[in-house]
Amino acid sequence: MAHETPDTPGETYDFRAIEAEWSEVWEREQPFRTPDASDSRPRKYILDMFPYPSGDLHMGHAEAFALGDAVARYWRQQGFNVLHPIGWDSFGLPAENAAIKRGVDPREWTYANIETQKQSMKRYGLSFDWERELHTSDPEYYRWNQWLFLKMHEKGLAYRKDSWVNWDPVDQTVLANEQVLPDGTSDRSGAVVVKKKLTQWYLRITDYADRLVDDLNQLEGTWPAKVISMQRNWIGRSIGAEVDFVVEGRDEPVTVFTTRPDTLHGATFMVVAPDSDLAAELVEGASDEVRERFRGYLERTQRLNEIERSTTDRPKTGIPLGRTAINPVNGERIPVWAADYLLADYGTGAVMAVPAHDQRDLDFARAFDLPVRVVVDTTQPVTGAIRIIPEDGELPDLEEVLPGRTGVALPGEGRLINSGSLNGLSKQPAIKRVIEQLEAEGRGRAAKNYRLRDWLISRQRFWGTPIPIVYDAEGNEIRVPEDQLPVRLPDTEGLDLAPKGKSPLAAATEWTNVPSPVDGSPATRDPDTMDTFMDSSWYWLRFLSPNDATKAFDPADADRWAPIDQYVGGVEHAILHLLYSRFITKVLFDLGYVTFTEPFSALLNQGMVLSGGSKMSKSKGGVDLGSEMDRHGVDAIRLTMAFAGPPEDDIDWEDVSPSGSAKFLARAWRLTGDITSAPEIEWKTGDEALRRVTHRFLAEAPGMLEAFKFNVVIARTMELVNAIRKTIDQGPGGGDAAVREATEVVAIALSLFAPYTAEDMWRRLGREGSVAFAGWRKAERNLLVQSTVTAVVQVDGKVRDKLEVDAKIGADELEALARETAGVKRSTAGRTIDKVIVRAPKIVSITTTAP
């Protein structure tokens, strides 16, 4: 589509010519190169989440990068030395899948997309330091992924284990828990995730669970509350107790975790997850019939995903394991069952069931005629569902406990009953006493539990960082020496990358079979690659020393620049990327490589760009960024993104007006053609009214910008443009010093959002250098004091007139002026003025009576 030049009077604002000229200047001069370490100015590290190169930039990128660039440009205007780098998160499944589909090497697809995105970024006028550009798929980068893995392996933070994992049957690879969506599907392929038992690599993120929760307090006020809440919930720290249950025929007790040890007297059976190691062990000594039933039940369980197993409205299923456990507080023998509503990775894979006070346990108890005992009087009216059982020894029949079999659990707090010495205590005192008793008897202890699980990083795909481990003939793990890094990916020629349920690297025999780095004996490389979230967990540190061939980053550079002052990106990364980055930063702190424990001091999440209320996509005819820039100009798109509303809100492209933004930019740009004064003119000689508007803007805009109220600042810039135009057209004209001063301020403000237009305005104003480094001017305090105010004149309680008066006017003078106004004369004609109250300089109140 042909580009549209706004149809307004005067000179032609040709955004295409302006873009071509300044793009060439920026490419030649690289003005946003980060100054070296000798620069003594204060520093700011501003970073946008780097993109995955799956194609050209889209409208979502356009919003995020426009906002991040505005932040970087603002701090440059404030005199800071700003680091604002860019790179590509270039490993990952989309590249591998595209390569399989096209029969090409993933490198070819990836780097072609990078070049496309890079050119679009440059066209978009983003103020990146291109000399620090990185790609996570470069061996020079992933070498340091491998180094970090080895450091963690040395400390026991990287380990292998055999366990049930999330398996994507379409992409044929494992997924971390964080990569499984709430509906049980893969966040990549959309396939329903199943469980599969594999030996995989994990990182011990759970060792850092408490620090990951507690340190969120440091981020209050600078991170979105929603993200902090999401991380707290995902880590899922629970405070309670571990309780040891002796199980018949087992030497070691079974330990369960509970947040309600006060309800132990109400535990009437135990549940173990059928796919847990504990269940397999317990059933081993059972009868042939029990073992056969268990095998069938386990197979049925494995066909379910976690969502299906956890849903509350699904009928409960389970089988008895033929074992009993001893309740440690009352000595009762309780049956042990396997039930699929319990997941193997929760706690120890076993729980005590308190059906009176947990709905899932109650549903299970009702399904299998298991006993129910109420041990907390919640002070709610007890319905026919459950009634309190007197302490007379034996439990009554289920029918008596649950009349009508309409069980409703009582999960609330209250006074304990049916609990021996705990009777009458409320929740917290009861919990304290139970834990004291358990600890004294060696049957339990205070404990914490976490929803968070260790980070599974193995992937059975090609396009990722090879794991730097080899195995000798006995299967022992051997670390690849650091001086042999990077372990490079092999060439794909002749290699079938199609997913087969195991890593395609295993088929690259020349690459896989290597001499042991210990003694030269035959050894085998680990064929898996790392989760690509490993790449992005620390990339922001590599930007500090991108060309250092001897270390991942220079600690001196980290001290100089890190942590990041402002991170900008989507809320979809709240758990995965942001949590992993926080974890890796704490690991690096413990290893002595950094002096801080949080990577991102402040976080800004932008909303989504929608079309007609729906998320944009190519398949649904989403808006094409390139076409929009062709039609309206880069600056109009950037300005529209920033002006649409608060950054965290979604933008519906059908509801905004890039053409309106283009017209405003043309109007602002055209001001420069009406200015006849020289750059050296003395500002103080200019029109005072316009100077007051200008300096009020200079004083108030920084606070708004630092609060990300970009839309408000743009609205105020528009008001300033209107005031300038009025001063030019109605006097004192384009030669006035205040007109030049205000127009230069407009150019500086627009440099944050519309850099092409701003640079051209600056040049047309006769200024040297780039407007991006002009500096935010300081407001003159004397121009911020109001010289006039609006005085309201009331007669008998009604506003009859208004006066623009000197802010320092006296009461007598104000009263005299008020009496002479037309409104007062008309309202008091034929009446007697009884009383006049003056509150100079703002109010005159006159009271009258009829003759």
From Swiss-Prot:
Question: Where is motif 'HIGH' region found?
Answer: 51-61
Keywords assigned by UniProt, alphabetized? Aminoacyl-tRNA synthetase, ATP-binding, Cytoplasm, Ligase, Nucleotide-binding, Protein biosynthesis
- The chain's coiled-coil residues are none
Q: Which GO terms describe its molecular function?
A: aminoacyl-tRNA deacylase activity; ATP binding; leucine-tRNA ligase activity
Q: Where does the chain bind ATP?
A: K618
Cite the EC number.
6.1.1.4
Pfam families recorded for this chain?
Answer: Anticodon_1, tRNA-synt_1, tRNA-synt_1_2
For this protein, the record's HAMAP family field holds: Leu_tRNA_synth_B
Q: Which family does it belong to?
A: Belongs to the class-I aminoacyl-tRNA synthetase family.
Under which name does UniProt file this protein?
Leucine--tRNA ligase
Q: Which organism is it from?
A: Clavibacter michiganensis subsp. michiganensis (strain NCPPB 382)
